[in-house]
Amino acid sequence: MKIKENLYAYPFLDEMILHNVLRSSWPVISKEELELVKLRKYSALSESTQKKLKIFQLLLDEPLKVKKNEVTIPETAYLALTHQCNLKCVYCYAEADMTKNYPDQLSFIEWFQLLEQLKDCGVKKVIFTGGEIGLNHDSLKYIDYAYQLGLSVGLITNGTLIGKKRNAQFLADRCESMTISLDSIDKEENDKNRGRGCYEIAMRGIRNLLDIGFHNIYVNATVTNYNLKSVDQTIEFFKENGIAYKLGGFSELGRGSMADISLSFEERKEIECKEKSAQRSAFLKPFTIKESCGLGLGEFVINPVGDIFACKLLETDDYKLGNIRKNKLADIYNHKEIELLESQNIHHLSGCQTCSFRYLCGGGCRAQHYYHTNDIHGVDRSECQLLQELIKNQMYRIWKQTEMT
């Protein structure tokens, strides 16, 4: 509901979220108070509500000053050592399996030289991923060398790489964090998603890390209609063991575009709300303007043949930035092709300019929108609808938390 230019109200439960778009701020007020605001009878509001409007600058029409994000070499690089995988998840966006063995992959020496180049270019963190990195027989050597170079190191594995305790200890001594894929604490439900035997692989790895005292463990849990019933039980397991987790529906990319395992809109909303509520820090912050999802600004990915992409979910020609055999990273990020990244924000995306949520969502995940619309500037309205519901839920939750402090 539009109250005036750049001031909107959204019903939530029995109250109203009052949102100043340009200031990216919001209090929660009663429906009765909203009527007074609509009539501009501010003096008739309670003293506490008047204070809310002042503190949250609800009546200001001046936009916040936004520092322009200049495209420079991001500080985090994802290094996909292989696209081979010993699992066959029904929703895998990369369609990884044991046949994904590309010709002319980067050699042992080239990976070492790449790590040195990343260090020299100012990259701070490398995250080794796949496929399953445990299938690259030199993965431990690359991780060790990155650590010796002084880079912060992380990895993503289905558990294969840490299946042996000596490997788990070796990695715990060198990695800042490790991310493991586990969809459910229920073995049958997990393996319906990821394939027979996957539960044991993941749990063995998690137990090995916990046994040696490594606790900076993250879990990626993907929810489909196969494992929806065990979500709460799975969350409880993560909490009991001090494991951070990311919970979400699968992306309709790769095998996920063909899988008949989708959640309904309401199921997705419930899962995403649970995931956002569990995050260590809120994904919304008052008085913060978000103009993009961060595509190409915070991270990039290099695949097994040296191709460089702006996002690990967007290994397509439209988002390819170059190849490390042909281009130096510094040259790529000074090249005119980086104009692509600069255009991936709400000022260039279809329909975003008139949406009241634009500075809160930043246009949403570009990968999701791209694969739904096949357009680098496209926007999928169903994704927008879901994100708006999640934003309202978090706006309300954040406000209630501030009221209690």
Residue locations for each model-derived region?
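N-terminal [4Fe-4S]-dependent radical SAM core
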Residues: 2-28, 45-78
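Short, small/polar residue-rich loop motifs at catalytic or cofactor-binding pockets
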Residues: 13, 293-297, 318
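Canonical Radical SAM [4Fe-4S] cluster-binding loop centered on the CxxxCxxC motif
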Residues: 70-72, 76-108
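Short loop/turn motifs at secondary-structure junctions and domain boundaries
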Residues: 71, 290-294
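Radical SAM/AdoMet-radical enzyme domain recognition
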Residues: 108-129, 136-250
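Short Fe-S-cluster ligation motifs
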Residues: 114-134, 343-344, 378-405
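C-terminal accessory region of radical SAM enzymes
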Residues: 214, 252, 260-288, 313-362, ...
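Cysteine-cluster motifs in flexible loop/terminal segments that predominantly coordinate metals
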Residues: 346-393
